[in-house]
Amino acid sequence: MPNFSNPEDRESLLPPPMNRRRFLQCSAVVGGGVIVSPLLRRAGDAPAGVPDSLLPWYRLPLCILQTVLRETDARNYDAAAVVSYMKKTGYNTLIVNAGGIVDFFQNPLPAANLDPFMNDRDILREITTACRAAGLRVMARVDFRGVEERVFRQHPDWFSMDAAGKPLQLDYTRPRLYASCYTGYYRNEHAEEFVRYLLAHYPLDGIWHNSIGWDGICHCPRCRESFLQATGAPVPEPESASPAALDGYMAWKTSAADKHMARMQATVKAFGDDKAYAAEVFSMYNPGGRINSGIDLYNARDHFDFMVGVAFPIESTEPTRFAELSYAGTVVRFMKSMAPEKEAVILYGENGTLHRYIMDPPVDLRIYLWEALAAGGRFWNANFAGAYPDATSDRRNAFNNIEACRFVRQHATLLAQHAPVATVGIYYSRPTRLFYRSPSAEGDRFDAAMKGFENVLVEGHIPYDFIPNDQLSPERLRRYRVVVLANVRCLAQPEIDQLSRFVWNGGNLLATFATSLNDGDGTARADFGLADLFGCSFTGKIADTRQDCYQYILQPKHPLVAPDSGATELLFNADRTLLCRPAPDAEVICTHVPEVHNQPPEKAWAESWSREFPTVIEHGYGKGRVLYFANQPDQINCDIGHPDARNLLSRGTRLLAGSLPVETSAPESVHIGLTRSLASPGQYILSLVNTTSGPVRPVRRCLPVFDLEVKLHLAVRELVSHQVLRAQGKCRIEAHGSDVRMRLSRLDDFCAVHFQMRS
């Protein structure tokens, strides 16, 4: 028996666990038999939130407008009109061009490149003065990724070089800018002087560092010298270098990026802690290439005063596709999991990013904003084609976000410093993400497993967040009833030890496919690192189960399959399946059925269904339980959406979690958010987001839903008061002790209720 210490008490937010019999008896739909107290009083005054004076402005709810000015916008720039639009729509912060590539102020510094349409005006002076008079915050947008040829010729030694000493240029810009690197003079000494000048001469509240990342390999003298000192080797060439050499370069580059961000942050903070510094970080799902920017939220969170995740509804992919409607909430949950005390902001654009002169689908965008709010997030509208959204070629979305912005402005005190409540933690592994920089031979993808599992949790109204691998600790794990390892290939031994201790002491684990088959640096293991927990061992063989393969229900009375087993012997399977041998004490629920060839159909039969290799196993480990899926139900749910895959994951999560903080009669198309105040214990906000619509994207129209019921089980003493922040129909709140029931007669788009609980 492992010598693990006993766990401390679980977080009080978690309700009592549920045994197997109770799991089978309970329904996900709120039914009768609820003891209800008389209608509680509404809060006369909003419960006390965090006083503004105790937090810097960038830790309070943000509604950001970014106007990415074109050179020609300077011709008729009207600062008063920009301010009027912001006041009308509810934005409280403006991010506007200062310069770098093109300067929108009278720049006296070296490498200046003044907007030719500005003449003797100073656009930055005009807009900062107007915003300050109106009580609006302003951050200056700076961009040091590269310069035009005229500026490059003045200072060629400031910029990036290839192995032959020739300047590097950016392929995606027109004109092709001459690129800069993390160690070069342009991004460092020049950028620092530039930022110091702005903060010393303009009434700014901070700096927005645009396009901070750089994806290439630089051979400038500074990079060569720094890399040689760090590694004792020359800068590698991608065409001839080994994967290990390129990984070594990326380790150095990540460190260089980290130092660069720290240097820029220090430059800004030299003017006071009230000056904000931030930049955007791209997809949490994209593994990137072997050579990438070296910047993600793992290092950015330490340097940025608020967290920004790029979340456009239409993804920049080939072919173009829509992101999930819940993606804005996903990004917020991830950022809040990284740094819950910081504002988590989604960066989107009412006129999109792929076709910047035309609106993005308006209903999808409104849903996006409500999804972000429901998870405790805020939003940032990046306007790329005009002085402000109502002064562009396409103005159809100019006031699309007005209700969401006004909601934040009206309830800013209550919304401040909120983070999601979570019963389930999805383990986010940076090493696993990096593993997928090279496509997997088995076809599994980093994003698909997590997206597929998230869809199950969102549709099932199961509160969740993420566990970043570098924040794994006994204290963090104690927050959760269930930890999900959605094909987390790469786990180091210390991670395995902590997860094992978590389960041994009473925690529960749900894992899929190749979880723990690689160590922390991606090296393959012969067997699962978590084999003792899974209750099985990997044979080293992988079955191609993409077509005509199934799962045989071996234990028809098990809660995972009991709702189906009366009508079927088989369940769906697809993608790949790892062939494993179960341990003697493991309970095999389903087994792998090899391909039953469908042609000719007269020969498409099997004498019996194979029982040799398990696909679904339940295994006890100490005081805890583990469900292991040797196949890929999460990726299947993402790509195909077959109900068998979804149901197995949903039932498995509920079985392990027991009673959940949220029960509801709402359909899957109504997404539920539950957040709690980090600064004022006992304060919660329950949100409902309606995504009910037709079967295609973009969403044409959100269809109202009626007669919804939500029950909260927060394991606190009682409800003191509530305040309906937004609702379309009648909203009735009832309670008995710590249980709260909300009945809503109609939901059009978004409903939110604030609760003050007594512990």
Give the ranges of each region predicted by the language model.
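N-terminal secretory signal peptides
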Residues: 1-18
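N-terminal twin-arginine translocation
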Residues: 15-25, 33-50
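Glycine-rich, aromatic-flanked loop segments that form ligand/cofactor-binding clefts
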Residues: 64, 92-96, 126-170, 208
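Aromatic- and glycine-enriched glycan-recognition loops and surfaces
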Residues: 71-89, 112-132, 259, 448, ...
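Aromatic-lined carbohydrate-binding/catalytic grooves of carbohydrate-active enzymes
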Residues: 89-121, 147-156, 216-226, 292-295, ...
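Active-site-adjacent "subsite" loops/lids of carbohydrate-active enzymes
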Residues: 145-202, 237-250
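Active-site neighborhood of glycoside hydrolase catalytic domains
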Residues: 186-292, 299-300
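Carbohydrate-binding surfaces of carbohydrate-active enzymes
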Residues: 242, 246-247, 251-283, 300-758
